Amino acid sequence: MRNTVRPAIWCGVVIGVWLIFRDVARGQVVNTPPVPDWIQAPGNKTNEAAFFSVGVELPPKMLKVIFLGASEGNMEVFVNGRAIGGGSGGSRAVSMDLTSSMDPGKNVIALRVLNPAGPARVSALIELNADYAQERWVATSGRWLARTTQQDGWSKVVTAPEGWEPAVPSGRVDATGEKNPFEPRNLLDAYNSWKLALGSGVATDPSGLTLPAGFKAELIRSALPAEDSWISMAFDSKGRLTLAREKRGFLRLTFDKNQTSKIEVLDHNLLECRGLLYIGTSLYANANNSKALVRLTDDDDDGVFEKTEELLKTEGGVGHGRNHIKRGPDGWLYIAHGNNVKPASQISPRSPLQRVAEDQLIPNPWDASMFDGDVLAPAGHVLRLNPANPAEVQMFAGGFRNPMDMAFNADGELFTFDADMEWDVGTPWYMPNRVLHIVAGADYGFRRGTGRFRQHFTDTLASVTDIGLASPTAVIFGTGAKFTEKYQRAMFICDWAYGRILAVHCGETGASFQGRSEVFLSGRPLNVTDICVGPDGALWFITGGRATQSGLYRVTYGGSEPSAPLNVTPTPPRSGAAEARELRRRLEAFEMPSGGVAGSKLFEEVWESLAHSDRWIRYAARGALERVAATQWMPRAAEEKNNSRLIAAALAVARMEAPERASAILERLTRVNWRDLAEDDAVGLVRALSVAFARGGAPSSNLSSAVLSQLEAVYPSPIAVLNPDLCRLLVFLKSSKVLAQTLPLIAAATRSEDLVEYPLVLRYLKEGWDIEARRVCFDALGRAGKLAGAQNYFRAIQSIRTEMEKAMDPTELAKVLRTVTNNLAMKAPPPPVAAKVHAWTLEELIPHLDKVSAGRSEAGGKAALLKAQCTACHRVSTDSTVASGIQGPDLSQISARFGRRDLLEHIWNPSKVIDEKYRQTTFVVQDGSEITGVVEREEGGAVVVRQNLLSEQTQAILLISVRERKISNISSMPEGLLSVLTLDQVLDLLAFFETASKPPVKP
């Protein structure tokens, strides 16, 4: 059933221009919208209807379509001829979620407006959020069509028939000092829709939620102010629901006919329990801010916990912290930890995940200064703990960023929904939000900085499916729900930011799964924090987090399809996929035979499986091999004729043995005939050599020569994903040919990932460079700077370019820059020392804001940028010839988020709002003095801070000397920057930001 707003009886507006959004490179994002114009229908009069319409073609894998509109008069909104809802008033835009109303491909969004007090004016912004973090916008402008007479089918217009004319723009919505209806503090894009729940006092009305036909959502309870925000939940054996409060402690709800009949505050001091689980009368709580896993026991079953035991204590941060817990089919507890949690000290040597390392062939020097730069392998991880013997704690799997939750399917397989690092979009190391099948001993490849494992690496595993824009929270399978079979078998994953619960349908693929996702439930706001199947067979979920309004909801199915719980017990005949999973599990459980491997049938199964066609089985077989002493099988590996087994064994040796013991089998790899290799084996061979050298250091001269001879002959490879790996390995071995072999790849590159990765790797070469090679790399960085990407993408471009410049002779650099100036963003010069003109106040400047639009000087704006030192820290324009810095937030689209007055206020008072990622930290040291700055990195027992973002100078503070550290509420951006500008220069500066944010005009 789709719930929509009942249309009002209003008159309205239409446009008919098709805006087609072409695919951009995977992993790229443009998150800044254009500023809408107010538009009118030509000749429209007071109390006369105006009609407007625009055609929109949806990109593939559309996630969310949000309509934002304001009108001088009453407005009604239509999608493909269907009335959706409406609003009135020009001071604040109304918001509507159009996702479920849109059709694949072409759509028409039409408006009808009637203003009894004057001509009808309207402004609108349509937000299209597509997969792979693509975001596009449609704003009202003169490209819309309009008319003042109604005709049949007007709300489905896709062309410009008789009677339609271009709409008449009457200025941007922020053109005057009046209130902007799209003011960002009042108006939130889809990603920030959770903020709508801040201070709302009541949870989102379920009648506004979108669900499949036959499903119904009920709001069981809205949290009262004293009940805090809710972040996790669990039913006990009596059907009572325990809710974890964001700050501390729990609530327990007792129900009577699905209504809350009793609420109890469980007076406990555990802080921020992100995970709750009942086993019998014991409640297990993963208390993030208490940094402990705790068991609370109600021995006499009287509803009071008499005993509290700390089962596991962990150190580290709390952002990506101690998350959900689940009970596995083996009876053990499975505990999800984000990458800020340091692995527990008592990890068992019997853990499935062993021998984890960074495995960076060429460590990147600025990885440690990036976000989460202190994170080391295994990063985010899943622990396994035996509740009967809590001392037995095993590392089950790792290589995650922040797995908030996990879920077992009906067959006992474990899954999670891991988070991306949104700053990395556009880079070759970007990992999307991904659904992962978690198997014993697996490393899913998350590493700090640029070191993320690529999905094709042999020593990691692929995702079940990638999800685009999202903020992952809870997950659950529909097992036991009174739903249709499709949804009983589905995995439900929760997207906190976009207000969605997605159903992921996992199809068997060999020993693992591949999935496709669909939106099951959505709302705005609907910041879902936890989800479970209740004892009544309904799907229960809660909203909350970040101090937002919480609600408890219940979803049931009342349609005509069968909804009895499925018999999930497998019956013969077993599928081939089930048999493949059984083989994978046997390999994961394999232990070294007590009598050695000679004559062992189990070991023979391991050895044969190294060449299995299924990647997951090969991975499990290599893990089993690593649990056997290498001395027992290395001689056999050296004589192995099958390339797949040889390469898998070589990777195992590289992970297990010292370099001198691994050299024989690595030398054997150099004698493999490359032309005989399947694609997987070619990838595996390069990865085995890379891991061996990353862990063991540079090889002997003989082995190095043999590897160079083999790989230089096959580089570049027709296997596209392999070329960056080959390039990296050849650079590490100081190949004399790799530079010349890579330049054609760079020149032909169009993807942002390739334009960044090759220069990133080649900058380590010390010899062989000439003017042309430098020019090709600088040109690639210039082209990369014109593509879309997130913050770390542009930081990487800047850092690579800076390092390349430092490695060049000034005369040579000047020659190169003369040939690529038009393509390369200029580095910001040192900020000039300017005399103060006047200590401006807001009261003096605000009355002049209406002059920003009138004939301002672009040259004056650029000069003001330099004089006010904006370019020393910020990227200020998409024009790559404008100087830029990267220490601060990207301002190239700032006026799309802030109106004139807000932008002026933020420049005048930088500490008004500070992005968490740019907050300074104050360190109080032993002598009582304070040092304040932005943390660059922590390493070697010291923290390195930059006290002045305009200087390259940093200061190291010994951690043992730190008495206290506290977050500063003072921005690193100094006050008074406008005091060096005249009034005209201030206005030119604001005009420059507005112009820089406008999308390019299409011919």
What do the PLM-derived regions correspond to, one by one?
Residues 78-85:
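Short strand-turn-strand beta-turns centered on an Asx-Gly dipeptide
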Residues 28-44, 106-189:
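An acidic-aromatic loop/edge-strand motif
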Residues 302, 863-890, 912-916, 929-931, ...:
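Periplasmic/extracellular electron-transfer cofactor-ligation site
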